[in-house]
Amino acid sequence: MTGKLAEKLPVTMSSLLNQLPDNLYPEEIPSALNLFSGSSDSVVHYNQMATENVMDIGLTNEKPNPELSYSGSFQPAPGNKTVTYLGKFAFDSPSNWCQDNIISLMSAGILGVPPASGALSTQTSTASMVQPPQGDVEAMYPALPPYSNCGDLYSEPVSFHDPQGNPGLAYSPQDYQSAKPALDSNLFPMIPDYNLYHHPNDMGSIPEHKPFQGMDPIRVNPPPITPLETIKAFKDKQIHPGFGSLPQPPLTLKPIRPRKYPNRPSKTPLHERPHACPAEGCDRRFSRSDELTRHLRIHTGHKPFQCRICMRSFSRSDHLTTHIRTHTGEKPFACEFCGRKFARSDERKRHAKIHLKQKEKKAEKGGAPSASSAPPVSLAPVVTTCA
């Protein structure tokens, strides 16, 4: 969209500035506005610049002639009168908001005097053409819901803490109620927020507000597992209410299969193994009582050690330890020859026998060619003499 100048005004901006009175900017600064009253240096007052105005210099850096001949219709106005300039712009393409393709310039009031009534009518007509109907705006954007006033939100006295340790200033509710008519609740929608400034020493007593977090059943830590002995004892008490008062039944020892080598002598002498197995038909003896206790679990079938992963029970703690390695994948025993790892030491020992057999075979193969490659020894003929 291009604009064409319909009427050229023979007036420059310098003429507008030259109409300002000299007493508009006083040379003396009032004492109330003096910012350097406390300083020792005297304040230097600046006089008005007597040089040419900036607006007087054109684009070609040529100073215009201050005395221009104006027509009769453009005479300089007196000091306190309104200067009104009118003009028109014409546009090529028509638009909806300007049917006549002509825009009238509004009148400019220089010294605060209200402009003419004709200029006001021009501005009003132009604004009414640009602004949409009020009904359409209300239909598109509904009105905000009313909120309560500020005084209703803060009914209790409010105190503000000073970080330097000064006592807080308390404000009574009457101060807020007196200022209530001056505020409009529709203009300032208020949301209550009680998180005021607090001293750093008082931050520990303020509860921390966290947003609601959904319960994820996967991330919730499971409760600790109840020992198996406690569960069994609780079940037995439910079945037999007087379980605690009844005497314990005698320990029954189940017979086990005989040893593979019953007559094999033990390395430990007999007098050093005082703890004998009380089971019938078992001739095992032990040098320590804990060894006897562990052995008796074979007869009783007691397995106090349970795996928490697969709930499998064991009679010995070392058996449970090696079993857990099957779940974790831990293999602490490595072979000295090939570096292969095992979860149990007996497995590594059994694997090491394979390397020992291979080593013996290599030694046998290496010794056989040396014996065959040796030159045959010629045997001297035995001469027998007859007497």
Curated annotation (Swiss-Prot):
Residue ranges, compositional bias (Basic and acidic residues): 269-283
Bias type Low complexity, positions: 368-387
Biological processes, Gene Ontology terms: cell migration involved in sprouting angiogenesis; cellular response to fibroblast growth factor stimulus; cellular response to vascular endothelial growth factor stimulus; circadian rhythm; endothelial cell chemotaxis; muscle organ development; negative regulation of apoptotic process; neuromuscular synaptic transmission
InterPro entries on file: EGR_N (IPR021849), Znf_C2H2_sf (IPR036236), Znf_C2H2_type (IPR013087)
Primary subcellular site in the record, as a coarse category: nucleus
Keyword Transferase included in the entry's annotation: no
Compositionally biased tracts (Basic residues): 350-360
UniProt keyword list: DNA-binding, Metal-binding, Nucleus, Repeat, Transcription, Transcription regulation, Zinc, Zinc-finger
Name used for this protein in its record: Early growth response protein 3
Gene: EGR3
